[in-house]
Every structure is written in structure tokens, then in C-alpha cells.
């Protein structure tokens, strides 16, 4: 994760660094291309020769002669980066992601060139204000600068370059919004990178107890409330779903709670994230190929806790509570079996038809308990819940389902702003019928069809009339659509920035408890 220090400079005077970046739009008509005359002349020559067009991701690397004017701001190198034509983007979210991808591309070039001190001339666009451009660019740089090398030897090639140390945004004019945008982008990106760190940890390290320890550390650093419910608490409260999934494990379960509850809060949002630290499928065992990636089954839990990192720093007017039911799902002599019946926190009974449909079982208890305990204005849950959502939406969209149109729209808007697109799927009585059980109130799978929707239908039994949206990130938590700021192999940190965007833009009274 990047440890770079960020700063905004009015101009390039006195700056020195390994790389200076100018972003160039792919426009049909051109005035001045970049702000420095000699660099502008060189770029124009490249345009005229057809060597550079400004299309997205295209690069032109210049090496200034330090005895001439081309020695811009003491830069060892100058990178001219094409960002495409922002006028081609149909939605504001598309322009935001264009500059986020530009930031990711810059980070990639910095890795190739082993850059430690980076200077970026803040690009101008009529579609975003300078603060928004700074936010997206910095977000992309931070996210693109991510690497996880904790378990590599010090002499390994992966440790030859450990990322950026200093980043200067050169704004060209005094604008407090630029510094604010830079801070917003940095905070959201660092929170997402922390979620990537959690997911990258092996399951023998990142256990339910590790979730609890992270929450306690974050709470202490930022004066948040923290509660850890132990196995004995769950037994007393009747959280049969979490306890059943944990039966085959040697690690005790935890219900991890982080609270940001300012005295002047108008409303409280509840975030719930699936925290299955390793999912073997239990008795309904998963196939061996690719099972090592099931350490990523806790990405929903990572997202809600790491979103709280940004919340703690920004201190919004709305209260936020994050809950992670944490356990692994293993087979063993005591493991829950297909055909078993359990009783959830709210008293509903469930027949376990498939032990690999465990995520909904632990989320059910967390949702019901969280609503009962905090009386939130609305609930959002995140989970790597079903393979069915991958079959339906691939790795491009996360699926959402819920009982409240206004909340769903707010979440869709937040996802668009964050570059994490969402696609709403239906819910209704026809899908609820698929999970009816002959021996219990409900069963934990609903057959081969509409698997993502029937999983949400299971969860709907535990939210009552509270406005609620479920976000299935099974297709996007890793192997997400390739972007310059998303690792090609490994966890994406999806969901964190969507939640942060939702909270930043929250308007009290928007969501009412009606459908």
C-alpha cells in the first residue's frame, strides 16, 4: 500500500523530482497542449508526425536537457499521458473514472521507471471542477501504487521498488478545492488498499480474531466504539446461523462491531459485511482448483470495516455502524450437515440444504441483530455471496437487490461516482417461494435458477421493513474488470469507495421505511 506523502503546489518553481506528468486530451481542435512552451512544442511535433495522438493510455517520454529551458521544475523525465476525449464520456461518473484510470496509468509508469518523487500538472476539463479532478487523479495514483509484498524476501525483485514517496499536484492557481479533493481521493483509496491488504493475507493469518484485532486498533486510533461478540455471546443471543457455519472450525467466531455515533447525528446507517475468512464449502465441499482464492470470501467484511477508516477521519454528520460476522467454513466431525435445521437470531428456522451457502446464514444473524440493536434508517450489506451473480453479470458489475427504491438509487449513484458500477436485480414473492422448506421456515438455497436473487430473498427474511440493499460482489471482489488502478491478479478492494461515496453524499430524510 502506498505510503506516499501528497501535497498541492501552486506552480512548478523550486520543485525537483524523478518524473513530471502532463495529461493531454485527445481533442479534434488544439490550442496550447501543455502549459510549458518547449514541452508543448515537442508534443505538437509528435502530433504532427503521428507519433502521439492523446488517446487514453498513450505515453510520450521526454528527457530534458538541463542546460535548456526544457529542464522543467528540475524533472529528470517528462511523461506526456494521453487521457482520451472526455467529451466522449456520456455520464459524469465516466469522466471521473477517466481521470482515475489516468492516475492508475501514471502509477504504472512510475513503477516501470522506479519513480519516488512524482509531479503531476493538474489537468483541466469542462466536465469536472478542479477539486473533483484532483480527487479522481489522486485516487487512481494511490490505488495504482498498491503492492502486497509482505511475504517476499528482502532481496526479491518484487521488493526492488516499494512505491512512491512524494507526490506533488501542480494546480496552476490557488484553489482550496484542489487540496480538499486530493485529501478525499487519498482517504478513499487508502481505505480500499487496506481492504486489499486484508484479503491478501493468508487464511492462517487473517482469522476472525484478526478481524477483531483490526477493529479494536482502528477504534482506539480514531475514538470509535468497538464491540466484539464472542461465541458465548452468540449462544446466549441465539445466533444459530453463525454458530452453525463455525461448527467445523478450530477458530472461534467473532461478531465485530465498529460504531461511529456522533451526538448530533440525524440518522444512523448500518453496514454489514460477510467475513468468511476461508470457505471450503464445508461438507458440501468445493472443487479443489481455485480453492485457495476462497480466502477472499471475507471481502465484504473488509469493505465495511475499511470504509469506517475513512468515516473515522472525515467525521460525517450521520452515524455509521459496521458489523462483520466472522468465521471460516470448514468440514470436520462437528461440522453442520445438509439437512440440519438451525434457528436464527430473530427466531426463524432454516433448513441447511447446502453447507456452501453459508454466507447468507451468518449475514442473517448479523442483519437481524444489528437492526434490533441500532434501529438504523437503512442497511447495506456486502458479500461475495454467489457464483450465480458472476454468471449473470460477469466481472463488470456488482449485483444489488433490495426492498427500497430510493436506497438502491443512492447506492447506484455512489457506485457510479466511485467507478464501481452496480446492476439492480429483482426481488419478489416468486423468488421467496423458491426458498420455502418443508421442514423449516426457509431453506438456504433455492435451486439452480436465479441463485443470486434467492440468496437475497433469504436475507430479506431478516430485515423486516427497514430499508435495505444487498450488494453481491462475488464477481468483482477479485478478477474485477481490468482497469489501470485495479490489480490484474488479486483483490480489488471493491465496495469501500462506493460506501464512502454513499456516506459523503448522504442527505438525511432521503430514505423512508416504505417500499
Swiss-Prot record:
Its main location: cytoplasm. Gene3D superfamilies: Leucine Aminopeptidase, subunit E, domain 1, Zn peptidases. Pfam families: Peptidase_M17, Peptidase_M17_N. Keywords: Aminopeptidase, Cytoplasm, Hydrolase, Manganese, Metal-binding, Protease. Mn(2+) 1 binds at residues 279, 356, 358. GO terms for biological process: proteolysis. It is an enzyme of class 3 (hydrolase). It catalyses: Release of an N-terminal amino acid, Xaa-|-Yaa-, in which Xaa is preferably Leu, but may be other amino acids including Pro although not Arg or Lys, and Yaa may be Pro. Amino acid amides and methyl esters are also readily hydrolyzed, but rates on arylamides are exceedingly low; Release of an N-terminal amino acid, preferentially leucine, but not glutamic or aspartic acids. GO terms for molecular function: manganese ion binding; metalloaminopeptidase activity. The active site is at 286, 360. Binds 2 manganese ions per subunit. It is found in: Cytoplasm. Its EC number is 3.4.11.1, 3.4.11.10. GO terms for cellular component: cytoplasm. Its cofactor is Mn(2+). Belongs to the peptidase M17 family. HAMAP family: Cytosol_peptidase_M17. This is Probable cytosol aminopeptidase. It comes from Desulforapulum autotrophicum (strain ATCC 43914 / DSM 3382 / VKM B-1955 / HRM2) (Desulfobacterium autotrophicum).
